[in-house]
Swiss-Prot record:
Note on domains (UniProt): The N-terminal domain is essential for RNAP assembly and basal transcription, whereas the C-terminal domain is involved in interaction with transcriptional regulators and with upstream promoter elements.
Function: DNA-dependent RNA polymerase catalyzes the transcription of DNA into RNA using the four ribonucleoside triphosphates as substrates.
Stretches the record annotates as Alpha N-terminal domain (alpha-NTD): 1-231
Protein name per the record: DNA-directed RNA polymerase subunit alpha
Gene3D superfamilies according to UniProt: 5' to 3' exonuclease, C-terminal subdomain (1.10.150.20), DNA-directed RNA polymerase, insert domain (2.170.120.12), RNA polymerase, RBP11-like subunit (3.30.1360.10)
High-level lineage: Eukaryota, Viridiplantae, Streptophyta, Embryophyta, Tracheophyta
InterPro entries the record matches: DNA-dir_RNA_pol_insert, DNA-dir_RNA_pol_RpoA/D/Rpb3, DNA-dir_RpoA, RBP11-like, RNAP_asu_C, RNApol_insert_sf
Species assigned in the record: Cuscuta reflexa
Amino acid sequence: MVREKVTVSTRTLQWKCVESRTDSKRLYYGRFILSPLTKGQADTIGIAMRRALLAEIEGTRITRVKFANTSHEYSTIAGIQESVHEILMNLKEIVLRSNLYGTCDASISIKGPGYVTAEDIILPPHVEIVDSTQHIAWLTEPINFFIGLKIERNHGYFIKTHANFEDGSYPIDALFMPVRNANHSINSYGNEKQEILFLEIWTNGSLTPKEALHEASRNLIDLFIPFLHMEEENLHLEDADHTIPLSPFTVYDKVAKLRKNKKKLSLESIFIDQLEFPPKIYNCLKKSNIFTLLDLLNNSQEDLIKIEHFHLEDVKQILGILGKHFALDLPKNLN
């Protein structure tokens, strides 16, 4: 356990981790402070951060299991102590860590007798088990046990429905949230005019509290970026019903207008989430610290190909968007 003395900055606003510990493989704890804040700011930030931590961070879970020769979820299999339903409930609790985009397949293939644990799951290279000791089933006889698994990365909660059922394949309610709990508290100082925000984070081990805080912060920033680029001339106040309709206005409209007025285009003011890239391309670029159009143009085609999960088709799609809307191209090689 790491614990630091709480010292309050009186000038620069800053986050600081004051306590960090690992209670188990599936329970991490971290306590952070943000200061100095003026009265009211701590509650505003604390509420937004807690919601982002609990609802916006992606996690990886098993969402579907395929058995051979099972008639329904509550059937039993000869040579296995647990029923199909109990095995599904055990698989629901398996904690995974990954940089997966979308879904992938995994499996378990083992011969009894013996215990089946998370360690026996055969995973693709980009997915790993957090706690290999998690129990799945007990094979009481020398039988061959094989099941297929579907793994998905998402956020929030997935609830199975009857429409999700297939022959021999069963969906699992999936809790994707890596953050198990988050609390915030506020301490006042300086004649009650300034505040310190305390934020406590518990995670399931797939992310550390510090990683969770960083991802939640990035997600909140992404939510507010559109407001930074909204132009007042696109807001039309209607006196009749006192509403403000927002006309459709994309970054491409902004570029066209700048060119028409012969004004210089600021590449660092255009963020990649404004470029309408597919989710896979956007996530790959973001994880490689490419956030703006200027960041993107500082990379060659060869640099982008080296990004994990990036393919030539993705680069071609980027080149198409850059050429169509900006008349720009990526350098073939920066060396």
